[in-house]
Regions:
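Glycine/aspartate-rich loop-and-adjacent alpha/beta segment that forms the canonical ThDP
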Residues: 2-83, 87, 100, 116, ...
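Low-complexity, highly charged intrinsically disordered N-terminal segments
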Residues: 28-30, 89, 96, 101-103, ...
Length: 123
């Protein structure tokens, strides 16, 4: 089991009593996607990878600002923090799309069919 476990060193601004809310924000923002892998499903002919998370909801910055370890960067180096947060947001979206493809391998085939080149053309 891999889990997001807020701790005192994260510096949750709302306090450790709000760690469940912080965890919810981590998941909703896409910072910590929820998924399961059950190899026993493979023997049943099923996909062993199950994505439980919904698409990131755009609350990444809210999540990051709620923890001192991330908020300190924004306070000290706002331009660099913005650049890094923008990059992280993009990477989270790309990672979520990757997880969606793992959860639905047929979508990979459909994407490939959509991108097929006309007869006689090569990439």
């Amino acid at each position: 089991i891999m889990a997001y476990s807020p701790c005192i060193n994260h510096g949750i601004k709302a306090g450790m009593g709000k760690s469940q809310e912080e965890t919810r924000l981590a998941v909703a923002s896409g910072y910590w996607p929820l998924y399961r892998y059950n190899p026993a499903l493979k023997a049943e002919g099923k996909n062993p990878f199950i994505l439980d998370s919904k698409a990131p909801d755009g609350t990444l910055r809210e999540f990051l600002r709620g923890e001192v370890r991330y908020a300190a960067l924004e306070k000290t180096f706002p331009e660099e923090a913005k650049r890094l947060h923008d990059r992280l947001e993009q990477e989270i979206l790309e990672h979520y799309e990757h997880l969606k493809r793992l959860a639905d391998p047929m979508s990979i085939c459909e994407e490939a069919q959509d991108k097929e080149l006309p007869v006689g053309k090569t990439a």
